[in-house]
């Protein structure tokens, strides 16, 4: 799911704290703002299959 909230991509080097915005650019430094929500899972997750199977077993 894509979030409407963005965070400055260079906040660690340019700001003291994360700068959040609804725009595509940072309001303080003008740098690109990126999606602040993490991905729900990684396709390269090598242990994801095992975690999901354990979760399925615990539901049964």
Swiss-Prot record:
Q: Entry's InterPro entries? A: H/ACA_rnp_Nop10, H/ACA_rnp_Nop10_sf, Nop10_arc-typ
Q: Which Gene3D superfamilies match?
A: H/ACA ribonucleoprotein complex, subunit Nop10
**GO MF annotations for this entry?**
snoRNA binding
Q: What are the protein's UniProt keywords?
A: Ribonucleoprotein, Ribosome biogenesis, rRNA processing
Q: Which family does it belong to?
A: Belongs to the NOP10 family.
* Record HAMAP family: Nop10
Q: What is this protein called?
A: Ribosome biogenesis protein Nop10
Which species does the entry assign this protein to? Answer: Haloarcula marismortui (strain ATCC 43049 / DSM 3752 / JCM 8966 / VKM B-1809) (Halobacterium marismortui)
Q: What is the lineage of its organism?
A: Archaea, Methanobacteriati, Methanobacteriota, Stenosarchaea group, Halobacteria
């Amino acid at each position: 799911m894509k979030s409407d909230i963005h965070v400055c991509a260079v906040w660690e080097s340019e700001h003291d704290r994360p700068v959040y915005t609804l725009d595509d650019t940072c309001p303080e430094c003008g740098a690109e703002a990126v999606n602040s929500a993490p991905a729900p899972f990684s396709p390269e997750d090598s242990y994801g299959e095992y975690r999901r199977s354990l979760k399925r077993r615990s539901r049964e």
